[in-house]
Structure formats: C-alpha cells, structure tokens
Amino acid sequence: MAFAAASALAQTPPDAGRILQETRPTERAPAVIVPPIVAPAPARSAAPAASGDVRVQVSHFEFSGNRALSTETLNAAVAPWAGRALNFGELIQAVEAVEARYKAAGYFLAQGYLPPQKIKDGGIEIGVSEGRLGEVRLEGESRVASSVLFRYLDRLPKGDALTLATVERQVLLINELAGGRASVDLQAGEQPGSTDVVLTQQSEPLVSARLDANNHGSPSTGVNRVGLNLNANSPFNLGERLSANVLFTNTGNLTSYNLRGELPVGGDGWRLSVGASRATYSLGGDFASLEASGTADSLRLGAAYPLIRSRASNLKLQIEADKSKLADHFGASSTHLDKQSQGLTATLSGDWLDEWLGGGSTRIDLALRSGQLDLGPTSATFDAPPAGPDTAGRFSKATLNAQRQQNLGKNLSLQLQLTWQLAGKNLDSSEKLGLGGPATLPGYANGEASGDSGALIKLALRWQARPELTLQRIERGNLLTAGLTPRRPHVE
C-alpha cells in the first residue's frame, strides 16, 4: 500500500529548477576491480630427522625481530605453550600463534620461524620477519605519469612493517586514476626479511564513450531520452578525467549539456572537481497552452577525500560549492521569472560488505546543504507571503539515502531503500525532494510527487537470470511515502 499526501501528487508544470534537478548528473566513480593482494606462503622448517617424539621443557619464550608488536603482546599469544614439554610440532604451533597475532593486527606479511637455538633456562627463541617494505618498482605502461604513481607509492612506509590496509588503500587509489589499471605483486626483497612491491600497469584508451537510452523523462518534456557520455582519460598524464555529456528527449523539448573535470591531488586520495551544465526546455503535452520554456545554468566546484578506502568498507567526505541561474518564460501570459541560487553541500558517503544472513552490501549517503536563493522582481512578487511560498533568502536541508542489498541465495536478492529529506523552510523546486523517478517511484516521472520534506521506503525483489541481466519487480504494496508538513503549506 502506498501513502502520500494528495497535494503532493497534484500535477504542476515543470520549471527550470525541476529541470536542473532532473538533469543533474550522478557523480559515481567507475567500479574498481583489483586482484586480491596475496601474501607469500610462509616457509616452514622441516622437522629434525629421526626426531620422533623428542620433547623439550619450555619455561618461557623469547622473541627476536619484533618491532611492530611488543614482547608482552607476543607472550600473551604463546601463553598456552609456555611451562610445558613440547615436541617440534607443538613448537610450530606456537610459531603459528605468533603469526596469527601479527595478521590480526594487519601485518599480513609477517612470518615466524625457529632460529638455531641456544636453550638457556628453558627459553625458546621465536624469530619474526615482520614483512618490511624493501624496494618499490613499476612495470608495464599506462597513460598516468610515473611521477604521479610514485606520489601514491611513496606513502608506503619504506623500512617499516607493511599492513594490508596500507597497501590495499594505495593500490585502490591508484586504480581510481583515469588512464590506467594496476595490480600489485609481492616479491622477496634483497635484504633478509624485506618484501618488494611490484606495481604492474595496464593502459586504458584515451577516449571512452557510453550511449544511454531510457524512458525516465516527463510527459511534458519527452518521456524517451537519449544520452551520450564522452570521457577523456588522463590526456595530460596526470590521472585526470574530462567528461562531456549531452542528453535530449524524443520530442526535442529538453536538451542538457554537462561538462566535468576531475584532478587527483597529492598521493592520499584527494580529488578536485569542476563542472558546468546548461539545460533548455519547453513544455508540451498537458502544459502546451502555457507556451512555457526556460533555461537552467549551473557551475560546481568540489573536493573529495577518502577517509577509509578498502575492499570491504569505504567512507568518503565531499564538499561542493555551486551556483545556479534559472529562468522561466510563459508566453501565454507574457511572464518572465528569473532567480539565482548558490550553496555549499557537505556529503558523507559510506559503503561496506558483510556476511550477515548470507551476506550483502550497505550504502549510506548523508548530506547537509545550506544556501541562498535570490529572486528577480517578478519572481519575488509571486513568492511573497501570504499567498506565495516564501522561498527567498537563506535555506538549509538535510538528506539521507540508505540502501541495503541482501543476498537471498539462488541469484535472488532483496533491496531496501530509505530516502529522506528535512528542510528548514519552503524550498525552491531545484531543492525539493522528488519521489518520482526510476530510483524511487517508477510509476511517476522525475520530479513528480515532490515536497520540501518527506521520506520514502522502498522494497525491491531482484532476480539475476544471467550475470549481465537483472530482473526487478517493485510492488506498490511495498512502498511507503510520508510527507512532513512544512511550516507554511506549499507542496508541489
């Protein structure tokens, strides 16, 4: 059963603000697929010949080569074997317990061994090779300059014990650079106990393209849409990506252009972005008599940093400033409306994988936005209270999008999605929460059933017949939308 305020579902003509929101590109990084980073198998000492069940009385253990973990920590790991008479197999178990303690702390290359013994007072020495970083080498070629790659590789702690989290983070960040892909191989170094990191590169094409076609449009501007996206991958060998996107509808009532550039900065995952867009529209269908048309122009500048980057979990902080200029013209009434908005958005995005109830993935995006809406003379007249919605001036809002993809087995999965927005006042159409669209309510076009504050819960059952094909069924009975009444009722 679906619930929504009747006023939220009333048809209202799209304007430049809604067109801006509808054509705003979704900035989602390409999937990064990197082969697992595997530690070399530990070399075990062979049992002494004809050792039989020879045992040695062990009062305590001594350790050599341990710097990352303290002797007290390692003593706790081998406590079950201290104060006993041990054979060779049991001594190896104590060595493996030391390795397990290192691996639990993230030192995935650490290896324990039994050096030649000089047993004194019942003490057995366990040596530790902590897997310290030796040399870092590049092999192969890519469009990304070696100097850029070494900005990332130089952050590996040379001479110190390597952790899986450190190596994995830098390799994943390198693979986010446009123009190349890379895999890492761990090899024994020249120095005893050291490990060399070899990064093998593979170049990507300079230009890539994608053609999209869908029926996600609005009846008044054209339901069927076609989009073309072009990417220039690292044309200046800096790992940057330049993108151009054009979208238009079958009726010709909507055309959108988007330009975007991303530049990696430093070697720890910082990225700067700049974007510009322009959309033009004219209304047909039920609103053709309005003779309405308009434009929506936008500029964006942003920065992003990965707080956590790994295979299993990620957390990213993004800050973006934007400025938009919106214009609507209604020929039937000779009315021209114009407005400008500017704002700052802070977004925290996280995702993680787990094995709960058969495994699944979770993604959460939380955004806080504050801005200023300035209206032209005619727009200000229509906006003024008590008859108008009073959207001019400062505004703020918080949005949340949470998704859970739960594996049910046999190519079947369940998707649970929560979309929520809370506004501090009545908002312009470019800032409203739209419940319509393919990602939310497929029964409504983009931007329909919109409001200042509201929530949507969606359940979707998915069956993947083949790896390249997913069938999805969304039941209206599984949808719940609840609108929160704003201070001054004004819901589109």
What label would you give each PLM region?
Residues 327-489:
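C-terminal outer-membrane beta-barrel translocator/porin domains of Gram-negative envelope proteins
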